[in-house]
Every structure is written in structure tokens, then in C-alpha cells.
Amino acid sequence: MKKVFKKCAPTPVYISPNQLTLDCFKTPFEQQLNHTNRWVVLAHLIPWDEVCNLYLKHVGVSDTGRPPLNPRVVLGSLIIKHMCNLDDRETVDQISENIYMQYFLGYSTFTSEAPFDASLFVEFRKRLGMDTLNAINEKIASLKTHMETKEKETTPTTDLEPLPDNSNSTESKNKGRIIFDATACPQDIAYPTDLDLLSDARKKSEELIDKLYSPALHVKKPRTYRRIARKLYLGTAQKKNKSRKQIRKATGSQLRLIKRNLKSINRLLDTYPQIPLKPKDYKYLLVINTFYEQQQQMYDSQSHRIEDRIVSIHQPHVRPIVRGKSQAKVEFGAKIHVSIIDGISFLDELSWDAFNEGSHMMDYVEKYHLRFGCYPRELLADQIYCTRANRAALKEKGIKLLAKPLGRPSAVQVHVSPGERNPIEGKFRQAKTAYGLNRIKAKLRDTSESWIASIILVLNLVKLAGVALPCFIVKFIDNLYASFSARWLIVPDSQFAYDNCGQLILMTEIFNSNKNNPKKRFLSFSADPI
């Protein structure tokens, strides 16, 4: 097999910095952009009019105040951020430096100015929400179905194709294959231990006392013993090996200090006609009260289990998700259920509490019916979905379950091979490794949901871009061919179909149709006249 060498840029000759000037630096901005660049392909792939209308319908347009940002800039910036796995500030810097990204956002000319302040990303995630991003994902994912429909229309039918078997009318109406699976999306928080969480709650309660104390209303400021409390905490936390007795003793001391601080906060609040705290601080107060009750109950019963356990003072919506994996038996974040249909991912459910995906399987099947107007022909799922009730419900709807059958193992293995579920496992690996699904850095509940939905959207865009790239290459080549055909009076033998996006056979057809005409083949793939 002949080795393919990648063409690299020429290595520049070293020049002293004293001889380099910014004005003399040559730029390629006067040349045409590369048509095969990923941002150019995505810019032509996304239906911006429909997507922007969905955004404006959800956000709304006000006649007063500052004019809103361009919806394409808002949505495109989120796509760039998650596709490149950048933080908010780095995303703004990359956009101001990259001409292809600016073309993707709809800019007509290059500008070195930042499109907006990086802090607006938080507002974008708040405004969009998971539902709007899922609607945009559905709209973009429909492009795959549209491509396949046009491909079937352009593909000629032959008499050798077998006729459809209508022996089972219910099963014949079902179309497609669907793969189910669930995973956890860990939040960017420290691993929670009771002692560390108690220390965080104690320090936050001390801050609330400082904010509530007023010399005009209170004679003496309540004592918090923060130095002693910090010393007691570090005395145990910094030990390499801690016994149960030492941990219980340190936990009890922190609980008593938090109880004292909460009593002081209540006495300070009694002197005010209304609660003077800001909404954010008042939320911290409610979280600390709930957290103290949970920890005190576990301390008294000497257990480590409780319902709706708080694992982060700053993100109280996060819950522990028991996964049973070898690397992490418990993950802290949201649990999502994803279905894959022909390489396209759909976010079926997102919950901050653990749930059994097998008990919700028929709800996911009904969502497939809402999207495509029919039930799937085949369903591929893990063992947790294959209960007797689910098997009976799928059989009633004519859906074939590709899983190990119940009962005594047969002599011939007929169940599905483990590699059949590789596509969805690969999607999870791609999302967690390349796009940051294994570390959600958003702090709020709604912004975290938008973060996860944006990553699912990026997965589909990457998939569709890989399908559509050969189509854009062929279209660009044929445009060059058409421009030179008029000059050289060359009439093409046949019109190439561009609707078959992603079919590698198109490139072969172009070579085969022109192989007997060297002049024509040269004009089809070269922009230089002979």
C-alpha cells in the first residue's frame, strides 16, 4: 500500500525580529476562503433562517432598550465553544482572531474586535435552555432524513430488488433502528466528603453573619470561633490516614459550630423588619439549613445514606449517581438518556436524580414515533431495558428487540453481539473526551442543562459535516468545470447529482466519466487553464 504524505506548510527562514514589521506581514485575506474548511461547510449546512426563528420565538424581541445580538452570532458562538472545547474567554478571543469562524457567524468582513463580552455566555445559556436547544437539534437532525430522501429519489430502481413482504402489516410499517443507553455527566466539583462539606458550610455561615451584623442594630457581634474551627478541621483533613473515630470526632465538632452559627444568624434576622439578604445569600442560608439537618441525621444514626443528599453547597441541585463503573462507582451530576438513530443523537431525558432507564423505555419509543411518524423496526438496548413488561410491549407494537432472549440458553447463539452497541458507546466517548461532557463547568441548574444539550447538538453537527463535506467538494469542482466549459466549449456528458451528499461513489463517477478525455478531466479538477 502506497504511503500517503500530508502536505505541510513551508518552513520559514529565520529573520531577526528587528527586521520584521507588522505592516509588511503578508496576509491571505484578499484570497478566497477554502471551501472545504469545516466552518465553511457548517455555515452552508445549518438552516440558519429556521434556527434563528426558533431562537427569536423563544427569547422574543423587545422594541425598547438596546438592540439584541444577532441570533446567528449567539448560536454560532455556542457551537464554536463546545466544538473546540474552549472556555468563554478563549472562545471570544478565537472568534476575533479566526476569519473562518467569523464567516461561520455570518460576518461579511473580517474584524479584530470582540463580538461581545465573554460574560454574556452565561446569559445565552440561561435564555436558550434545554428545550430550545433540543428543538434546534431536531431541526438540524432533520437534514439527515432530507438527504436520505433525496438520495432515494435520485437512485434508480432495478427489477432485481426484492418486493416488500407484507405478511405482517404492523411490522412492515415500522422503519429504522434505534439504540438506547444512559450515562452520567459529572459536574466540575471537588469530590464531596462529609468533613469538607461541613467546613464549606461553616465558612459560608460565617460570611452570612458578617453581612447581617450591623453596629446600629446589634450591640455585640456574635462570636464564630473561625480560627479554632479552621484549626480543628485541618488537624484531621490533612492527615494521610484517618481513622473512623477521628473522622467522627471532627465531624461532630464542625456540626456543633454550624449549629451555633445558625442560631446566631436567626437572632440577627429577628432584629430586621424583613430579610435583608440578597436572593443568592438567602439561597445559601436555606441550603445550609437543609444540609445541617441531613448531616445531623446521618451523624445520629451513624449512617452515610439519606434521600436527596446535598453534595455541594454551591451547587445544591447536584446529586450522586451510582454507576458501578470500575473507574468511578459514583458520579456527581446529571443523568441523561440518549437515543441514536442512523448516527444522529437525541437527548430523550435529563434528570438530576437517579432513574431506572428501563422503566422509561416505552416513553422513549413514543418519542421516536413523534419524531418520525412510525415506530422503529429494530431496537438495540442494554440488559436493563429487557424486562418482561418491555418485551411484551415491544412485541405488541411489532418492534424487534435485539437482545439476549429469556429462558434457557439455546444451542445456537442468536442474540446480538456486543459490538452492535458500539455506536452509542463511541458517541459517549467522543462527547466526554473531545467536547467536555465528562466535566460540566456551568454552575447553575439551567445553564448546566443548556451546556449538555449544546454538546449533543455539536455531536450531530460534526456527523452531518462529515456527511456533507464530499458534496461541497463535488459542487465546488463542478462549478469550476462549468466556468471553464463555456470557455473551451466542452459539454458535460451528464449532470452530477449533488443530493447524494456523503456518497464517495460521486468522486469515482467523475473520474470514470472523464477518463477518456484528458483535457476535460484536467478542466474538471484544476483552476489553471491549459
Q: Language-model segments: which ranges?
A:
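Short, conserved catalytic/metal-binding motifs centered on acidic residues
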Residues: 37, 75-77, 91-95, 117-121, ...
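Charged, often Cys/His-bearing segments associated with DNA-binding zinc-finger transcription factors
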Residues: 1-47, 409, 469-530
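Basic, amphipathic alpha-helical segments enriched in Lys/Arg and hydrophobic/aromatic residues
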Residues: 284-286, 292-299, 416-500, 504-510
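Active-site- or DNA-interface-adjacent structural scaffold in DNA-acting proteins
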Residues: 108, 112-315
